[in-house]
A protein has these predicted regions:
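Acyl-donor-binding surface of acyltransferase catalytic domains
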Residues: 1-15, 54, 92
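Polyanionic, low-complexity segments and short acidic motifs
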Residues: 2, 19-23, 159
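Short amphipathic alpha-helix that is part of the acyltransferase structural core
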Residues: 14-82
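A broad, low-specificity signal marking well-ordered, structured residues that form hydrophobic/aromatic
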Residues: 25, 85, 117
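Core nucleotidyl-transferase/polymerase catalytic module
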Residues: 63-66, 88, 104
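Carboxylate/His-rich catalytic cores and anion/metal-binding grooves
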Residues: 79-89, 96
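Acyl-donor binding region in acyl/amide transferases
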Residues: 90-166
Length: 166
């Protein structure tokens, strides 16, 4: 398995090596409270428009935010956020503390596993939902997830708007 992972790492084309003309986005990690509040406002806007949810103070915030790493994709020229997700690494015995554990009974199935990455609150601005922005966001997560966090498993919750509730 390690051999396959090393082969994958060698053949992976980093999104940072793309031609500048192909990339209209800038990827980064939230590293201060001002940026955290900016992504919380972005999340609130996306979720309120899509699901009709209202947020106190216009911020989608919870206790998980302070223990997570926050990935942001911005439009290169304006600096506006176009896509976002948050990450938290758990060991199996900690999985009951995850956001997913609030929504699903994950403890019996995941508590024995090492290095579980929870991804959540992912959202993309409606003008950028063609797939390119989300692809760029995920591609930029790969180095962190594989090399820094060394995640072995990935889990998370997703909210999807369905037309006519089908």
């Amino acid at each position: 398995m390690l051999e396959k992972l090393n082969h994958y790492r060698q053949t992976l084309t980093s999104p940072l090596r793309q031609k500048p003309s192909q990339n209209q986005f800038r990827f980064g990690w939230v590293d201060n409270l001002k940026e955290l509040q900016e992504v919380q406002r972005f999340r609130a806007n996306q979720f309120s428009h899509q699901f009709g949810i209202s947020f106190e103070d216009g911020l989608d915030q919870d206790l998980y935010d302070f223990g997570c790493e926050h990935a942001v994709l911005r439009e290169k020229w304006t600096g506006e956020i176009v896509a976002y997700t948050r990450l938290k690494l758990f060991q199996g015995h900690e999985i009951g503390q995850s956001y997913s554990a609030k929504e699903f009974d994950v403890v019996p199935n995941f508590s024995h596993l090492p290095s579980i990455l929870e991804i959540g609150r992912t959202c993309v601005h409606p003008q950028f939902r063609s797939g390119k922005a989300l692809s760029m966001l995920w591609l930029n997560l790969v180095p962190k997830v594989l090399w820094s966090m060394r995640a072995k498993y990935v889990m998370g919750c997703v909210s999807i708007h369905l037309e006519d509730n089908l």
